[in-house]
């Protein structure tokens, strides 16, 4: 069987289900798959196929995730669903599945529960930009007022974490009844799909973002100057463009005088490509691995930031013992390790392997960063944690 060609006709959007255990995330995922396949065509996935999530490894961390795809008339969606709470924590922090928007599932029989809050907080910390609410199990609640109360609670909780609780879409439905093919509840799934289409804006493609290339290597070519190599993370660099060298040292400006790939000269290097960029008047010693080449003014170097961190368990090859304040590991950003110190939240004395925690990190030298940047925590080259920059402080 020939591999199906990936057709890039419609815009592609990444979403996922979040919410408390047993509130119906996987049932909703199956219901979306079925109802949209029935309505707009495509392949339907069963609950058991989704629930039986395969193990993946992302930066050495074991995560169980199910990936399904579905279409609406205007878009193609890739949807992730995780079986366990720990899988969500790891998934969101490592960025294994970056979400352009999330569907928060809340059982109307329960209302918001501890993991509801935790997933909203995580979404805020890791930069999930949009949340849509699906109130599930509404077929089991006869009281209109109770449904209104739950909706109000969910909206208030979202507002508490700086999401637009008053304005975001809330759909009241029943994933199970939709899956069983009851038309009034199937209609609610279509309503949810319409909300995804209209509420989550089309994501900006990497190629349309400002140019950034993490520097992996630096060469000096006699008679031509200095070449830096790496994979373009986003944007495009053209011959003649002004670029900045950011991070580790004082930011400097230079000009790209050539781009080459596989020993061929090109006019430009684009997102996703491995290339060498020739820099005008830059000495071999002015640049080093760990810096980035970027569009001037698009990214700044920082040393102190608040982060959300997942600490690997012993089984994942992490530490066997907790760490305390004063811990000084290496923080691996893009291509390089930088030593840093940590500050734990008030009242937290130690962090155990397998925990997730908010911490403030101060690096010994500045790194080019934006909120949402992922990093690994390492000790002697071994990964012991994964994190994401939640808020830049300095």
Swiss-Prot record:
CDD domains: EF_Tu, EFTU_II, EFTU_III. GTP binds at residues 19-26, 81-85, 136-139. This is Elongation factor Tu 1. Residues 81-84 are annotated as: G3. The keyword Protease does not apply. Transmembrane segments: none annotated. The keyword Ribosomal protein does not apply. It comes from Shewanella baltica (strain OS195). Mg(2+) binds at residue 26.
């Amino acid at each position: 069987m020939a591999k199906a060609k990936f057709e890039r006709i419609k815009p592609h959007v990444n979403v996922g289900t979040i919410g408390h255990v047993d509130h119906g995330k996987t049932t909703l995922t199956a219901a979306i798959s079925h109802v949209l396949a029935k309505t707009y065509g495509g392949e339907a996935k069963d609950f058991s196929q989704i629930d039986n999530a395969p193990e993946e490894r992302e930066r050495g961390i074991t995560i169980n995730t199910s990936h399904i795809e579905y279409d609406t008339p205007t878009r193609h969606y890739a949807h992730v669903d995780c079986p366990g709470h720990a899988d969500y924590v790891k998934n969101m922090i490592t960025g294994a599945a970056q979400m352009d928007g999330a569907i928060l599932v809340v059982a109307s029989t329960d209302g918001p529960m501890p993991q509801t809050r935790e997933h909203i907080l995580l979404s805020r910390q890791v930069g999930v930009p949009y949340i849509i609410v699906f109130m599930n199990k509404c077929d089991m609640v006869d009281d209109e007022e109770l449904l209104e109360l739950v909706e109000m609670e969910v909206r208030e909780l979202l507002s508490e974490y700086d999401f637009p609780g008053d304005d975001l879409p809330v759909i009241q439905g029943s994933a199970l009844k939709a899956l069983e093919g009851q038309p009034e509840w199937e209609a609610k799934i279509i309503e949810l799909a319409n909300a995804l289409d209209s509420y989550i804006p089309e994501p900006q493609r990497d190629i349309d973002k400002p140019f950034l290339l993490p520097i992996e290597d630096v060469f000096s070519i006699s008679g031509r100057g200095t070449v830096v190599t790496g994979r373009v993370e986003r944007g495009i660099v053209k011959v003649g463009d002004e670029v900045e060298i950011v991070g580790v040292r004082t930011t400097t400006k230079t000009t790209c005088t050539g781009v080459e790939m596989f020993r061929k000269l090109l006019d430009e290097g684009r997102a996703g490509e491995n290339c060498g960029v020739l820099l005008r008047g830059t000495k071999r010693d002015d640049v080093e691995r760990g810096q980035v080449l970027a569009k001037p003014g698009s990214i700044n170097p920082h040393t102190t930031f608040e982060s959300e961190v997942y600490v690997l368990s012993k089984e994942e090859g992490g530490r066997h013992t907790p760490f305390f304040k004063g811990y000084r590991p290496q923080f691996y950003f893009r291509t390089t390790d930088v030593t840093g110190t940590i500050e734990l939240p008030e009242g937290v004395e130690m962090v155990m392997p397998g925990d997730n925690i908010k911490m403030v990190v101060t690096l010994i030298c500045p790194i080019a960063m934006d909120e949402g940047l992922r990093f690994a925590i390492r000790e002697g080259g071994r990964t012991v944690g994964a994190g994401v920059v939640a808020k830049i402080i300095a």
